[in-house]
């Protein structure tokens, strides 16, 4: 599932190309994705100017000049790409936005696990996003903040940094990579982390996410940016997907385990912990 780096990459690839364009028409090829599409979607954003393209957590947000915003979640296999005027619609193209420059913005989703909503812009932070945690690349992620969220939590730190109520956008791949970089065992309980470990973890999360954004995100199967290009952070993965391979730091064997049904990869030597 696309996480913060993938959605940030998508935003970066679309923003400059979409701002000031007009949505001339919206065509719904079906009435539902993961959830039912609003029957008012076309009427509420047709003939409106695009003011901004931004991201919050794993959501892509397109703001219009009529105080509405389009919220896009890619789900497992969603793609949101710009296509030329002569583009021929494909099987899983579910929503088509005709733009004033002749191009088309296409939402394609093979598994139909993605979501598209349209809301009043001022509704987003007040209601839709009010339970989300801090952005990991912002100044809001501090030692004091994260310590306050971990200090009573006798839950593995891997689960906690993937909790969007604490920190948004640190998905499964980036959690394993960040914990490895910080040399913290994924099973260590949040309440047992020392201050220096929390500081190291914050630094590692930021470093991993920044590198992933620079590489255009991680494409394991479906993700592409708005220009239909894959991400290349896969080539920089240090532990994720490397079960039974040698650790790049110490040559120990990379271990694969599970946390809440999600695969976790770590080095038992570099991330050694006497207790969790």
UniProtKB/Swiss-Prot annotation:
Residue sites binding DNA per the record: 92, 111, 153
EC number(s) given by UniProt: 3.2.2.23, 4.2.99.18
Gene3D superfamilies with a match to the protein in the record: 1.10.8.50, MutM-like, N-terminal
Biological process, per Gene Ontology: base-excision repair
Spans traversing the lipid bilayer: none
Known cofactor(s): Zn(2+)
Keywords, sorted A to Z: DNA damage, DNA repair, DNA-binding, Glycosidase, Hydrolase, Lyase, Metal-binding, Multifunctional enzyme, Zinc, Zinc-finger
GO molecular function, one term: damaged DNA binding
Domain of life: Bacteria
InterPro entries: DNA_glyclase/AP_lyase_DNA-bd (IPR015886), DNA_glyclase_Znf_dom_DNA_BS (IPR015887), Formamido-pyr_DNA_Glyclase (IPR020629), FPG_cat (IPR012319), MutM-like_N-ter (IPR035937), Ribosomal_uS13-like_H2TH (IPR010979), Znf_DNA_glyclase/AP_lyase (IPR000214), Znf_FPG/IleRS (IPR010663)
Catalytic activity reported: Hydrolysis of DNA containing ring-opened 7-methylguanine residues, releasing 2,6-diamino-4-hydroxy-5-(N-methyl)formamidopyrimidine; 2'-deoxyribonucleotide-(2'-deoxyribose 5'-phosphate)-2'-deoxyribonucleotide-DNA = a 3'-end 2'-deoxyribonucleotide-(2,3-dehydro-2,3-deoxyribose 5'-phosphate)-DNA + a 5'-end 5'-phospho-2'-deoxyribonucleoside-DNA + H(+)
Record note on cofactor: Binds 1 zinc ion per subunit.
Zinc finger (FPG-type): 238-272
Active site per UniProt: 2-3, 58, 262
Subunit structure: Monomer.
Purpose: Involved in base excision repair of DNA damaged by oxidation or by mutagenic agents. Acts as a DNA glycosylase that recognizes and removes damaged bases. Has a preference for oxidized purines, such as 7,8-dihydro-8-oxoguanine (8-oxoG). Has AP (apurinic/apyrimidinic) lyase activity and introduces nicks in the DNA strand. Cleaves the DNA backbone by beta-delta elimination to generate a single-strand break at the site of the removed base with both 3'- and 5'-phosphates.
Family the UniProt entry places it in: Belongs to the FPG family.
Protein name (record): Formamidopyrimidine-DNA glycosylase
Native organism: Rickettsia felis (strain ATCC VR-1525 / URRWXCal2)
């Amino acid at each position: 599932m696309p996480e913060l780096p993938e959605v940030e990459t998508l935003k970066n690839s679309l923003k400059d190309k979409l701002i000031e364009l007009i949505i001339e028409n919206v065509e719904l090829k079906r009435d539902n994705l993961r959830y039912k599409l609003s029957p008012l979607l076309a009427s509420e954003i047709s003939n409106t100017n695009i003011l901004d393209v931004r991201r919050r957590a794993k959501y892509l947000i397109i703001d219009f000049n009529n105080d509405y915003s389009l919220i896009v979640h890619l789900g497992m296999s969603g793609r949101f790409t710009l296509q030329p005027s002569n583009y021929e619609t494909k099987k899983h193209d579910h929503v088509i936005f005709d733009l004033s420059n002749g191009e088309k913005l296409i939402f394609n989703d093979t598994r139909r696990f993605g979501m598209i909503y349209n809301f009043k812009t001022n509704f987003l932070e007040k209601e839709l996003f009010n339970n989300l945690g801090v952005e990991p690349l912002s100044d809001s992620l501090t030692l004091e903040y994260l310590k306050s969220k971990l200090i009573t939590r006798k839950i593995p730190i891997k689960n906690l940094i993937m909790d969007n109520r604490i920190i948004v956008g640190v998905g499964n791949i980036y959690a394993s990579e960040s914990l490895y970089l910080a040399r913290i065992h994924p099973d260590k309980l949040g309440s047992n982390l020392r201050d220096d470990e929390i500081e190291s973890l914050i630094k590692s999360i930021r470093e991993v996410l920044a590198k992933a954004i620079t590489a255009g995100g991680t494409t394991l199967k479906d993700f592409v940016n708005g220009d239909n290009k894959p991400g290349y952070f896969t080539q920089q993965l240090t532990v994720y997907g490397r079960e039974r391979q040698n650790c790049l730091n110490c040559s120990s064997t990379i271990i694969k385990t599970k946390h809440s049904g999600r695969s976790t990869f770590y080095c038992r030597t570099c991330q050694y912990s006497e207790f969790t």
